[in-house]
UniProtKB/Swiss-Prot annotation:
Belongs to the UPF0145 family. SUPFAM superfamilies: YbjQ-like (SSF117782). InterPro entries: UPF0145_dom_sf, UPF0145_YbjQ-like. This is UPF0145 protein.
C-alpha cells in the first residue's frame, strides 16, 4: 500500500476516493523513562526512551490507518497528516493520530 503526504501519486490515476481514515494510538509514559529523561534534561542530552516511544506510537498509528484503508477496499492513502497530543493530568499519556484519504489507484503494470 502506498501511503503519502502528497495529495496525489505521481504517475498514478486515482480511480476512486473512499473516505478519510484514521489510526489512533494512546500510550503511557514509563516511570523509569521519566527518571532518565529528567537526568538528560538536566545534563542537556536526548531522551532515547521517549524518542523510541514516539517512533513506536507513530508507526502503530500509521499501521492502523493503513489497515482501515484496506478494510474498505483502498490500495493507497494520500494527504497523510500525523498529529501528536500530550494527555493526562500529569501529561503522562501521548496520543498519536494518523489521518489521510483512502483511495483506489490504478493497478501496477509489470
Amino acid at each position: 500500500m502506498i501511503v503519502t503526504t502528497s495529495p496525489n501519486i505521481e504517475g498514478k490515476q486515482i480511480i476512486e476516493y473512499k473516505k478519510i481514515v484514521f489510526g489512533e494510538v494512546i500510550t503511557g509514559v514509563n516511570f523509569m523513562k521519566d527518571i532518565g529523561a529528567g537526568l538528560r534534561n538536566f545534563f542537556g542530552g536526548r531522551s532515547q526512551g521517549y524518542e523510541d516511544e514516539l517512533i513506536n506510537a507513530r508507526e502503530e498509528a500509521i499501521k492502523e490507518m493503513e489497515q482501515r484503508a484496506k478494510d474498505i477496499g483502498a490500495n493507497a492513502v494520500i494527504g497523510v497528516d500525523i498529529d501528536y497530543e500530550v494527555l493526562g493530568a500529569d501529561n503522562g499519556m501521548l496520543m498519536v493520530t494518523a489521518s489521510g484519504t483512502a483511495v483506489v489507484i490504478e493497478a501496477q503494470d509489470y
